[in-house]
Structure formats: structure tokens, C-alpha cells
Amino acid sequence: MRMVRRFESDHGRKTLGEVRVLRPRRQLSLKSGPYGEKTMRTTSTAALSCIFGVLVAACGTGDQGGVGLEAEARPAALAFSAQSDVVHVYNWVDYIEPALLEKFTAETGIKVVYDTYESNEVLETKLMAGKTGYDVVVPSTGFLDRQIAAGALQKLDRSRLPNWSNLDREILQHLNRHDPGNQYAVNYMWGTAGIGYNEAQVKAVMPDAPVDSWRLIFDPAIASKFKDCGIALIDAPSDISFIALSYLGKDPNSESPEDLALAEKALLAIRPYIRMIDAARYIDALATGEICVAIGWNGGVLQARDRAAEAGQGHVIKYSIPKEGTLLFFDSLAIPKDAPHPDNAHAFINFLQRPEVAAANSNFVKYANGNAASFALVNDAVRTDPAIYPPAELKSRLVPDTVESPEFSRMLNRTWTRFVSGS
């Protein structure tokens, strides 16, 4: 069942509209900085190092205060579709500072109807079917190429995006490999997948647990030890198969049926020890001690860390980038081909690229953003957090995902179904 939250505020006679929540994904994050890229299916460590070394920077704290918003559960509706003063946004859950939606409405009079999804696969299914009713979507680069090729997205009008000048040039170069000429998308946030763990619970079970390795989860002999305190995986087929192949020493972007079969074998071997496969619930479960180990996105694990600290129950949550390597992802803002309100979509995207807005967003969501001009405004704690900006020794471990062929996606979905069901 999906949960509905409605954020409203009065600014004259304007209201924000609805924020419909399915389930979170990569939760919250902060800044903008190092990135890497991989063409074809090999990664150049030197190229990654060059890209990661580009952002150095400035100081300043940008403590952005949030606006208190009341939440109310009620049935969702797309009642605003025919109106001109509305923008329909489809984004990952907990992937925006809610106060910014209110601010956008206050400044423009445009209501925000905000729906959420839990995986790229869900978004792509809707985009490929067409007539989504959405004006702004947030695909990852691994899916962007084929959405452009299929005609699911429309070109951006740069004349309506004056804040384009604030964008990080290195990230634009990365996106250019997926979107030649940067015609269809603008980076929103970027981050990594890794291991989130409850420090005390893990130590109690296994004092010498390999928290810096995917062995912690993929070695059945080790995973079995943590069955009782709980292991969670994000419900993200592409990301988990990428990670499984990294653990096995294979090309994580391989589309070989043989490699996928090896990944499936590794996953099925640990399936009896997995308590939760969910792109959202693992965050609170990690924060409250319901689980002790998770494969999650860095922002989600950091959000669990913050929630645990706020609760004051003694749970200390850590994030690790495994030594075998992991996924580096980039999420971008784009406009569906048949968006009902493209002018409002451009206004919303341009708003998000204002430096102070991008900084406030990163401070809340705990992910790095693609706005170079915002860097000095991001909180120091975010800018210096190695879970957000990995240090030099970790940068070579990050591998960007590439585009999946439709054939591989079908194979992967069948594999994932078997894994989730345990068959």
C-alpha cells in the first residue's frame, strides 16, 4: 500500500499540493565533488582519479533551516493535471528537502504534486509506456541512454535554464557519455552503494567481521552468523547484481549470461540469511537495531546514522565502501516527452540548480549534488564526510554503471524474481 503525505502552505491563495510517498531509496545527502566514469565495460582508474581530483574548495557552512510541514494521510489524486499552475514531479523517496517544495510554490505560485518510486525499473516502465502525467523525473545514468533513444524524454531548453552555468563541468562531461551534448538531462545528485552496519551489534556477533569487504554479506559462512541480528538488501536488481559481480571479481557491468548465473548462485547461497529486501525500510530498521547489516545507498545509511543518533538508544551506524569495489551512480533531472507542463518543469529544474537551493537539498538528503556553485554553501560536516566524498584511497574502488541492454534487463528481472522468492 502506498502512503500519502500532503504538504500544504498558504502563500496568498497558493498551496503546495500533494507529496505522495511510495518508499524511500537513497536517502538524503549532501554535496558535490568527485566523480568517475567508465566507457564501454572497462574503467580507467587514471581517468577516475583525474575526475575525482577536480573539486577543491572553499569553506563556509550552509546550515539551511528546514520549514516545519505537517503531514496528513489521505487518498492520492491527480486532480491538478489540467491546470497550468502545477508541476508533477516523480522522484526517489526522501530525495529532496520538503521545505524547498514549499519555497518553490511561494516564489512561483506553481503547485508541486510529488510522487515517489523505489527503483529505476519502476520509473522506466512508466516512461516507456508513455502518458505518465509527470513533468520532471529523475533517472540514473545507467538507464538514461535508452530512455533518450526510445524518445521517452524531451530536449531541455537551455534558454529557460539560466542556472545551467552553476553546473559542475566534470559531471557534465560524465553525463555527455550518456546524453551527447547534455541535451536531455542535468545532474541532480550522485552517490555510492555500500555496507551499512550497526557497529556494536556486528562486533558482538563477530569481533573481526570484515566490514570493509562484500564477504561480510556474500560469504555464506559469515552471513549465517548475522541471520539473527538481521541482514537487509536494497530492492534494486541492477545495483545488487553489480555488487555481486564485484564481489566475484567479475566485470560488474558484464551482461554475460554466465556471469549473471554466477551472481545468481552467490545471491541464492545467502538468501536464507536475508531478513529484508526493501529499498526503504532498511533505513529505519538499521537505525533502530532491527537489522545489523545492510547493502544500501550511502545517503540512506547516513540517514539511518542520523536517526539512530537522534533516538539516543546507543545504536552507532557506520558506512563502508568495500575493497572489492562498488557502484558509483549519477541521478539526473529530465522531462518526459509528453510532459503536460514543460514550462513549469523547466522552472522547477532551474530552481533546484540555484546554489543555495542545491546546498540546502544536499544538507538534507546526504548526497553530493552536481552544482559546483553550491559547494561552498554546503555544511562542513557534509563536505568533509568520507561517506559522501570518498578519500583518495577509496576513489579507485568506484565504478560507474553503464547502460543495460533490454535483453539483459529481462534476464536480470527473471533472476531477481527467483532470488526474492528464494527459488
Positions of PLM-derived features:
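Extracytoplasmic ligand-binding site segments that recognize negatively charged/polar headgroups
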Residues: N91, I96, V122, G133, ...
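Conserved C-terminal helix/tail region of periplasmic/extracytoplasmic solute-binding proteins
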Residues: D284, A392-S423
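A bilobed periplasmic-binding-protein/Venus flytrap-type ligand-binding module shared by bacterial periplasmic
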Residues: G33, G196-Q201, S246-G249, F329-H341, ...
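Mature extracytoplasmic/periplasmic domains
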Residues: P336-R397
